[in-house]
Design a protein with these regions (language model features):
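Conserved beta-strand/loop scaffold segments within soluble protein domains that form the structured core
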Residues: 131-133, 137-426, 440-468
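Short acidic (Asp/Glu) and glycine-rich catalytic loops that position anionic groups and cofactors
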Residues: 18, 33-37, 396-397
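N-terminal amphipathic, basic helical "cap/leader" segment at the start of enzyme domains
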Residues: 2-6, 10, 25-172, 176-177, ...
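Extended intrinsically disordered or low-complexity segments
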Residues: 14-15, 339
């Protein structure tokens, strides 16, 4: 009998191609005040940011490692380089990007996607953006889409100072404090009042450096009555040492505004993905999260929505695929503060080859959140007896005038369904891949076509060789 292939050994093709490490600058490994000072000087931070970084480091050193969730014992910050500057500064014209970096992003389809269906693109390589551009017609609407470094030091400096790490503070948890100390790169977006951005903006993050971390900061403000769809993609080649991603996303959705934030995460399976995402939604505002998590060795990701305004809404649609050697602990959180607020979580988790998938949901309804409604649905698919799937719901309801529900289901692939598809001419492997793709359809149907195709390809890649 042929030995069953392991997901961790599958060739991830374009994602796992490593570039030669030819950095302009690589910070020494570890976390000390001297290293943070050096980073701040390297980036020419304003004084308030220099102080913020050092304060965040102090908080990081004081805070304990979370005592719940997956083990992160394999992550040693003394062996992580927190800043790696590529040899190219940021370009606004694709042809000016160095050829080797350009080749990497072209393999990932970034310039093609920009030409076909995006209003603007930011591409980050290790710790800094190497490309950033927005269409003229979008900029003419007053939409600001730039890198965080330019926003921090340029004409939007006051806005950055007002919003930066106010929603996610360094005291939230240890890795939020780490982010505050060493953040670099990321995107800044401001959509003016009443502006409807009809096609998405996208940022793509690629970590090529071995034994390094990526700590980009994304700050988006969608003003009153405006709307935006923002796409985020992530990948890295696999190494035999730990890499770390501890980015931060802060989203401000103003009165009657709407923001959809879509993510396809395909980190390599030596990655610790400890990301923090949060949205603050004002009266009548809508936040929609669409999330696909396929990579990393350990993943902890729980986008949080604070429904501050009356009649504000949140929707979270997610899929997680945990294969061999993966422990993906994901979910979503919502806090209902305003009256007549509503939240809906609809997730799918898939585990195979001993992978562990955990879904955590947290619903908090404050005392004044009269007539709040919340629905949580989690469905899990285990493809073998070695895998594991857990659901950990938490509810804190402080008013009687609320309707809150939770539903969880765990199952396996029906042999009858596989046999039926095989009778129609499909191989067993293709039949199982098709069933799993259909199970994850809740996310793929919410994505633009190119990204839905990429997600389904990732599922097929993970399923390859799963039949012994």
């Amino acid at each position: 009998m042929k030995e069953k292939s392991q997901v961790a050994d599958i060739d991830r093709s374009v994602y796992d191609i490593r570039d030669k490490e030819d950095d302009a600058y690589r910070m020494q490994e570890g976390l000390t005040p001297e290293i943070i000072d050096k980073l701040s000087k390297e980036k020419d931070d304003p004084v308030w940011m220099q102080q913020f970084r050092l304060q965040s480091l102090q908080i990081y050193n004081e805070m304990p490692v979370p005592d719940w969730g997956p083990s992160i014992e394999g992550l040693d910050m003394d062996h992580i380089a927190t800043y790696v500057r590529p040899k190219s500064d940021m370009k606004n014209d694709w042809k000016d990007v160095p050829q080797d970096i350009k080749d990497t992003f072209e393999r990932l389809g970034i310039p093609q996607a920009e030409r076909k269906s995006l209003a603007g693109v930011g591409a980050q390589y290790d710790s800094e953006l190497v490309y950033h551009n927005v269409r003229d017609e979008v900029a003419a609407q007053g939409v600001v889409y730039t890198d965080m470094e330019s926003a921090l030091k340029g004409e939007y400096a006051d806005m950055v100072h007002k919003y930066f790490m106010k929603l996610v503070t360094p005291r939230d948890h240890k890795f939020a404090a780490l982010h505050g100390a060493v953040w670099s790169g990321g995107s800044f977006v401001y959509v003016p009042k009443g502006v409807q951005v009809s096609i998405p903006l996208q940022s793509y993050f690629r970590l090529n450096a071995k034994g390094a971390g990526q700590f980009e900061h994304t700050l988006i403000i969608v003003d009153e009555g405006a709307s935006l769809h923002f796409l985020e993609g992530c990948s890295a080649p696999k190494y035999n040492v730990a890499n770390l991603h501890a980015g931060c996303v802060e989203l401000y959705v103003k009165k009657n505004a709407k923001l959809r934030y879509s993510t396809i995460e395909n980190w390599s399976k030596n990655m610790y993905n400890l990301n923090t995402k949060r949205a603050l939604v004002e009266e009548g505002g809508v936040i929609e999260w669409v999330s696909g998590s396929f990579g990393s060795h350990v993943g902890c990701l729980y986008p949080m929505s604070v429904l501050k305004g009356d009649n504000s809404k949140m929707e979270f649609t997610g899929v997680t695929f945990a294969g061999a050697g993966q422990n993906l602990d994901t979910g979503a959180k919502v806090v209902h503060i305003g009256r007549n607020t509503s939240s809906y979580m609809n997730t799918r988790s898939i585990s195979k080859s001993g992978g562990i998938s955990t879904f955590r949901s947290s619903v908090v309804v404050q005392k004044g959140a009269k007539h709040a409604k919340s629905s949580v649905s989690c469905q899990s698919l285990m493809l073998d007896s070695e895998s594991r799937s857990d659901t950990v719901p938490a509810m804190d309801i402080r008013t009687k005038d609320a309707a809150v529900g939770h539903e969880a289901k765990i199952g396996s692939i029906s042999n009858e369904a596989v046999f039926y598809l095989m009778s129609r001419g499909m191989s067993e492997e293709d039949a199982r891949a098709l069933i799993v793709s259909g199970f994850a359809d809740n996310v793929s149907k919410e994505l633009p076509l190119e990204y839905a195709v990429e997600m389904n390809n990732l599922i097929r890649l993970e399923m390859k060789g799963s039949i012994g």
